[in-house]
A protein has these predicted regions:
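N-terminal intrinsically disordered, cationic/polar leader segments
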Residues: 1-107, 111-155
Length: 155
């Protein structure tokens, strides 16, 4: 086998594009909410999604919703869909799914974190600093849950 043929069979990973796919900010009780002195309760929801775009090209997206409440009043709600397009060639099928779910999500998360913090500050609130996320553990938990569900449906 020639050297060029060997190189063409090597796994390849490229980040084609990182972008904000969707961004939403709601401040339902403005301007009065800015007079609140109580610290809000922050709820953070996060999910990931992967879609093939074409052969060897995938979109990975992290959806994050941050809701800040004082009592029952919503101070603000930020929803961000941070996405990336990744080209992945010659990867064994067993490695592709974890690469998309874990590695690509780890690449996107710092961008998501920056957008959430920036939007909160520009809206007149303190920055929201999202804690690091263990995407590998999330992936393993999801896989275990899927295996448990498939085992339960076959019995």
């Amino acid at each position: 086998m020639t050297e060029a043929a060997q190189e063409s069979n090597q796994p390849a990973f490229n980040i084609e594009k990182v972008y904000v796919r969707d961004l939403s900010l709601e401040i339902p009780h403005a301007p009065n909410i800015f007079l609140e002195r109580e610290s809000p309760q922050i709820d953070v929801q996060l999910s990931t999604q992967t879609e093939p775009i074409e052969k060897d090209v995938y979109e990975v997206m992290i959806t994050n919703t941050v809701t800040a409440k004082v009592g029952e009043k919503v101070m603000f709600l930020i929803e961000v869909k941070q996405a990336g397009i990744f080209q992945i060639r010659n990867m064994p099928p067993a490695d592709l799914e974890p690469t998309l779910a874990v590695m690509c999500s780890n690449i996107l998360f710092p961008y998501l974190r920056e957008v959430v913090s920036d939007v909160a500050v520009r809206a007149g609130f303190a920055p929201i600093l999202l804690n690091p996320v263990n995407f590998e553990r999330l992936y393993q938990t999801r896989q275990s849950k899927l295996q448990t569900e498939s085992t339960a449906t076959t019995h």
